[in-house]
Amino acid sequence: MEKNIKKYSKIYKNALLVNDFSDIDEKVASYECRLQQMYDSQTYLEHNVYPTMDVAKIYAIIAMCLELKQDGYLDKEIIDIVNSGFAKLRKAFMILEKIIDILPFAYTIAKKWNITDYENRVKDGSITYDYFKVSEGKIEYCISKCMYIEMFEYYGIRSLCKIFCITDETAYSNLTKHVEFIRHSDHSCGDCCHDEVIDIKCLKK
């Protein structure tokens, strides 16, 4: 776990630097202490059983949120601060998505990814789907239980799981030539996550 603590404390420190925080070394030390305690907990062992989930990363982000919430920051501020720490890491992924969006079969790639992710999530039990429908040019699903939500909720910050929920919206925002993503509801602040992934070609028929 020492490697993970070092990795994520560096990301947290970068987020604090980017946002002009003071007493950064003290804040990073507090974060490292909190994250170590979380990694050493029985709850971490219970949560760290899902192959499709990087629980070390999830806990690291929860620890960041708890540190910032303790300092009085609001949810929107916390989400922006935490995301700023991961900006450089996400840049390469965004570039890859924009390259995929140039390809004529971009929707097919998105479709295959969704189906594979669904199958893997069902297999390891990390996400419970009310339904997952695949039709011509569209995937629609509804998620009623999600271990991302459960972990954030355990630490009393369910609404901040939006950090993970919005990654779908961010990803599809780079596939605008071929894919339309519609989020009807968000599980971090509602009863379920209800999304549609649509082939834009089918909308034009």
What do the PLM-derived regions correspond to, one by one?
Residues Y148-M151, K201-K205:
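Short, charged/polar, Gly/Pro-enriched secondary-structure boundary elements
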Residues A56-I58, I62, L66-Y155:
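Amphipathic interaction/junction segments at domain boundaries or subunit interfaces
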Residues D130-S188:
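Short, hydrophobic/π-rich interface segment
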Residues D191-K201:
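C-terminal edge-of-domain segments
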